C-alpha cells in the first residue's frame, strides 16, 4: 500500500483546543489533500481510531528553559489513522508538506510503525530577508503569505518581520544625495514605536503603518510555525531635529562621507536617558508582538554605529561620556566593547521581561 492510498482512508483530522496556530494550518493542508474534515477536541486520545489522523505541537523540551525539542514524529497506518507531531510546532508545516508531497508517494513501509526525524539544526533563520522585509518587498505581485508558506515548507524556523510599509523611510537629505536609500532596509526600532524621549520625532501615521506591516508579517510567521524576529541596524542615526532639542545626547558620527552630503549622528548610548529610551522601545514592541523571538543587530554601516569603535567610516568618535579621546587605542577599544555588550544586554533584558526565550544576535564582521 502506498501513502497516498492510506491518506485516502483518512476520515477525520483531529487537533486539540489551545494549540498553536500552525496546527490548524497543517490540518488545513492535510484536509485539502484528503477531503477529511477537521475536528477540534479538548484533548487527543492516545489510542488511534481507524481513519482518525491527529496533529499536535506539544511544548516538550529537552531541558528546562531550552527551546522545544525539534523532533518530528510521523505515523500513517493502512486504515487511515496516524499522527503528525512536532515539538513547539516549528517544523510542523514542513513535516506536513513532506508527508503529503514526498512520503505519501512511496510504500507505507516504516510509516505504519512511525518514524522520527531530528533536524540537524534547531534554528534555520532567514538573514537579511530580501523579499519579505528588505528592498525586494515592493516588487510587483509579491504575496507575503505565499512567501512565508514557502519558508515554512523548506524547514525554516525563524523569520524576520520588521519591514517598512512604504518603499522608503522618512530619512531626508540634500538634493542629489543617495544616502537616504540606505534606510529602506533593516529598519531600526524607532521606525515602529516611540519612547517618552523621542515621541513626535516621527509622525504617528508613519509609525502605525510600519507597525501594522510588522504585525502582519508576525501573524503570517505564527500561522506557519515560524518564530518572528527583527533585523535592525542599531544604534541608527536620528534626525538633527532631535539634537536641536537634546544637544547633550549627541553620539558618534556614523555616515559614510563618500555617500552622504551631510553628517548623521546617533544618540550616545552612555547616557542613562538613552538607555531608557531603547528599553522603552523594546518593551513597546514586545507588548505589540509578545512572541518576538530574536533581534539581530547590525551596525557600523548604513547610518548606524557604536561610538568610539575604530571601524566607523570617519574613524573613532563619539560623545563625551564614555572615555576621553586622548586615551590610547587599546583602552578606548576595551571601553567601547564593554558598552556594546552592555547595549546588547539591555535589549535582551527588556525583551526577556516579556519573552524569556528572546535572544539578541549580532553581526561581528563590521567591527
Where do the PLM segments sit?
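Active-site neighborhood of glycoside hydrolase catalytic domains
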Residues: 273-367
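Acidic carboxylate-rich catalytic motifs and surrounding loops in phosphoryl-/glycosyl-chemistry enzymes
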Residues: 41-44, 233, 360-367
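Short helix-loop-beta junction
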Residues: 29-37
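Short, well-ordered secondary-structure micro-motifs within conserved domains or adaptor modules
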Residues: 37-68
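Feature activates predominantly on carbohydrate-active enzymes
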Residues: 5-6, 10, 14-21, 26-29, ...
